[in-house]
């Protein structure tokens, strides 16, 4: 029987309806039940030197649970009044310090909305592939089977971009081993993480990828959103990514609307009664 991955759960064809009656469809449960893919250990004690200006390949987080981050970011800057109102009164997460009962959760992921950026870096960061072209860097993610385009042709960020789920990104090499990415134009409907931490349309995200050696990259993600937070802060700080063998098969982790509806009828709706 063909096996697929749906929202982080292993689903065997029509057996899903029975499974969903026993397992919560919430994003937190998806994170906990997804089959872990442990990065393969390096074949040698000392990795080869890093290639210059090259992130090509398939990468995975060295510590799987650190990549999944089911309870949200470890810490963040204080909320502004606007950010606190959204976090405490509007968003109803199923995980983290402000989690609510399952029948009250309004996480967009439970309706199969896109995770968006940077949530796809802060929750369920699974294997992803980097493809470099002369004018772009493409990042292809396992979770929700989505991709990002990072322009490297020297263009500037747009001044007033239309909001996008994954924003508008430009990148450049700060040196031979450090790739910097800036992203703006992010849709306010997305959450930052599983804990329902919000962001506004003023959000600016900076990513720093440092190629330490042939097999290792350190990822740092900086959040700068003056409407939602009092100060810029680091959502990821030197997260270790490991290069995977070229034969690695990136799985499907797709949220199917039919499965989300089945979960809603079997679990979420009865929980509100």
Report each predicted region and the residues it spans.
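PEST-like low-complexity, intrinsically disordered acidic/proline/serine-rich tracts
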Residues: 2-3, 18, 30-273
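Bacterial N-terminal signal peptides
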Residues: 13-28
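A general, composition-driven signal for non-globular sequence regions
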Residues: 8-9, 26, 47
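N-terminal secretory signal peptides that target proteins for export/translocation
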Residues: 1-13
């Amino acid at each position: 029987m063909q096996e697929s991955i749906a929202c982080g759960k292993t689903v065997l064809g029509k057996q899903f309806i029975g499974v969903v009656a026993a397992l919560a469809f919430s994003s937190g449960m998806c994170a906990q039940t997804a089959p872990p893919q442990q990065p393969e250990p390096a074949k040698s004690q000392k990795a080869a030197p890093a290639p210059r200006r090259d992130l090509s390949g398939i990468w995975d987080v060295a510590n799987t649970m650190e990549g999944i981050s089911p309870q949200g970011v470890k810490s963040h800057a204080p909320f502004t009044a606007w950010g606190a109102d959204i976090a405490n009164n509007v968003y109803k997460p199923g995980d983290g310090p402000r989690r609510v009962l399952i029948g009250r959760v309004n996480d967009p992921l439970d309706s199969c909305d896109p995770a968006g950026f940077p949530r796809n870096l802060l929750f369920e960061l699974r294997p992803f592939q980097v493809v470099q072209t002369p004018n772009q860097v493409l990042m292809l993610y396992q979770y929700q089977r989505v991709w990002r385009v990072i322009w490297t042709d020297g263009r500037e960020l747009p001044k007033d971009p239309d909001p996008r789920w994954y924003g508008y990104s430009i990148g450049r090499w700060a040196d031979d081993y450090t790739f910097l990415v800036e992203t703006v134009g992010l849709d306010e409907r997305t959450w930052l993480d599983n804990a329902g931490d919000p962001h506004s349309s003023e959000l600016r995200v900076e990513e720093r990828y440092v190629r330490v050696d042939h097999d290792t990259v350190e990822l740092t993600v900086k959040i700068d959103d003056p409407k939602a937070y009092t100060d810029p802060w680091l959502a990821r700080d030197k997260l270790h990514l490991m290069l995977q063998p070229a034969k690695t098969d990136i799985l499907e982790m797709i949220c199917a609307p039919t499965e989300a509806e089945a979960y809603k009828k079997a679990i979420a709706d009865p929980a509100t009664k």
